[in-house]
Amino acid sequence: METFLQQIINGLVLGSMYALVALGYTMVYGIINLINFAHGEILMVGALVSWTVVSALADTGLPGWALMVVALLCAIVVCTLLNFAVERIAYRPLRNAPRLAPLITAMGMSLLLQTLAMIVWKPNPKPFPLLLPSVAIDLGGPVITVTQILILVLTFIILGGLLFLVNHTKLGRAMRATAENPRVAGLMGVKPDVVISATFVIGAALAAVAGLMWAANYGTVQHSMGFMPGLKAFTAAVLGGIGNLAGAMLGGVVLGLIEAIGAGYLGDLTGGVLGSHYADIFAFVALILVLTLRPSGLLGERVADRA
């Protein structure tokens, strides 16, 4: 039971990070029907920018929490500017093109960002310093670290803020109107191009936060680190219902729990043949099952394909 509860905690932390990235996927898809496969690389850039800032300020005497705040702000600025440029240069000219063209462009952009990051930051993994006290709080068997608590609290604050933004602000109404029908929204005074750019910017900010969380939780960063979390976050978005914000949140948490619990018991289930490093299999088995049994996702609705 203790092992199970520990994996629940680990799964909630992992799922929180997946949820933040999945929200970026689902927001963009909900508005322009694009799967932005370069989104995982925004997480990677956020992590590497955070590492750069923390390394540069390591000798200034700033406390760890202050370094984390500065690194987070810098990561958000860089990632939002980068994603804004990606949308403006790579995706906007293809908005009315056949769907295969933007999809291929997104894959190409993913590889381009990985390559540029490898050139700028070099291919070797870099240790991310411990910024918060390495205190493990005993919960009567399972333990949780200060960093994990911060990840959970920050994630739920961000998710609550995002739901408020989408449901109770002028920008949120414009986003929902654009998602429903960009042409009609334009006739009502909404500027679809501005709304779409804002959606990419918000998604990038969420990915930047997730990038810093990932680096702080796992203690290492490198140019290729965004691919697998990005792919799993996409799986989470599909699991919950692509285009549905609540579905992305639920999908992230569910996927994190599946992966963590699976990793904790994989060795026992296979008689020691497979170790926890094979845990990635659970995410993709979940994706296959969802696409087979419920393609619309847990909270998704069956809708007619838009022309």
Kindly label every feature range from the protein language model.
Residues 2-17, 144, 165-170, 196-237, ...:
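Inter-helical junctions in multi-pass inner-membrane proteins, predominant
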Residues 61-109, 116, 250-255, 259, ...:
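Alpha-helical transmembrane segments within multi-pass membrane transporters and channels
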Residues 20, 25, 77-79, 232-255, ...:
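Hydrophobic alpha-helical transmembrane segments of polytopic membrane proteins
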Residues 4-53, 85-101, 237-245:
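Single transmembrane alpha-helix segments in multi-pass membrane proteins
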Residues 143-221, 245-251:
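Helix-loop-helix "hairpin" substructures at the membrane interface of multi-pass membrane proteins
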Residues 93-94, 99-168, 195-198, 261-264, ...:
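Transmembrane helix-bundle core of multi-pass membrane transporters
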Residues 31-34, 38-85, 265-273:
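Membrane-embedded helix boundary and interhelical linker motif in transport proteins
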Residues 1-21, 49, 60-70, 97-101, ...:
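Membrane-interfacial amphipathic/re-entrant helices at transmembrane-helix boundaries
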